[in-house]
């Protein structure tokens, strides 16, 4: 099983992606800001449940920074397709992580009250099949929290490096989620603050045919704190409403029978 899973990963992600992610995930403004938004949304989900200590699964947990945060809200477990990612999680002291693919989760039916898939389903050839697998492991009325990249015209080098299959609009995300057997309770765009800069940079790079190995380097130390605070501040808006556009799209949905 391990070998089959590992060979499904693009070579770039096998050799370079996870070591870089492990180094930057705790401090890079984008990950810090996103994690604060996710934290606020998970707290919102937990408030709707009868159990104050829910069982939570992070699908595609990567090197584990989000999983550590999720442990503040319940019994958090993780699964990732990469043996390298699982090892990095263990280096963080996380021992509730399994090796497995999103399309074949190594868990029993009706196991979790909350499942997160944070920038995961865009990697899948069949995103609806992956969402149905998430539905399988969710308990009745359990919630899934999805975070995905938005708008195909924002396609950039990080999409190529990360082996993305697509970026979403809110209608396309909602359609996939509902087709998989969920009722969407809330959805919005996110990261509106950096929408225009990202659009400009990626458009110029395409126009000039510039290439970069990764976008992780966009982490100017003097601006890292302000950038992360600006991104994270969106959680106060998202707690009360929606954003009309952004670099990402986010969705909370409930499993229905």
Regions found by a protein language model. Give the residues of each.
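C-terminal helical/coil "lid" or tail adjacent to the Rossmann-like core of SAM-dependent
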Residues: 194-228
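A short glycine-rich, Lys/Arg-flanked "PGG" loop and its adjoining helix->strand segment in the class I
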Residues: 128-143
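Di-metal (Zn2+ and/or Mg2+/Mn2+) metal-binding site signature of metallo-dependent hydrolases
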Residues: 123, 127
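Conserved S-adenosyl-L-methionine
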Residues: 182-192
């Amino acid at each position: 099983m391990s070998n089959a899973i590992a060979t499904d990963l693009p070579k770039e992600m096998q050799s370079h992606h996870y070591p870089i992610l492990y180094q930057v995930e705790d401090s890079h403004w984008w990950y810090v800001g996103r994690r604060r938004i996710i934290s606020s949304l998970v707290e919102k989900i937990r408030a709707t449940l009868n159990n104050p200590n829910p069982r939570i699964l992070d699908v595609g947990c990567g090197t584990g920074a989000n999983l550590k945060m999720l442990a503040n809200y319940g019994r958090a477990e993780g699964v990732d397709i990469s043996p390298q990612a699982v090892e990095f999680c263990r280096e963080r002291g996380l021992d509730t992580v399994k090796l497995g693919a999103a399309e074949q989760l190594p868990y029993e039916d009706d196991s979790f009250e909350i499942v997160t898939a944070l920038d995961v389903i865009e990697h899948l050839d069949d995103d609806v099949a992956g969402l149905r697998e998430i539905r399988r492991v969710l308990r009745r009325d359990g919630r899934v929290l999805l975070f995905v990249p938005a708008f195909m015209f924002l396609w950039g080098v990080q999409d190529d490096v990360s082996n993305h299959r697509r970026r979403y609009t809110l209608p396309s995300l909602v359609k996939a989620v509902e087709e998989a057997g969920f009722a969407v309770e809330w959805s919005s765009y996110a990261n509106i603050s950096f929408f225009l800069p990202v659009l400009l940079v990626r458009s110029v790079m395409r126009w000039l045919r510039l290439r970069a190995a990764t976008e992780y380097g966009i982490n100017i130390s003097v601006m890292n704190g302000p950038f992360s605070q600006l991104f994270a501040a969106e959680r106060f808006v998202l707690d009360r409403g929606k954003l009309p556009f952004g670099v990402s799209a986010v969705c909370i949905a409930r499993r229905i029978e």
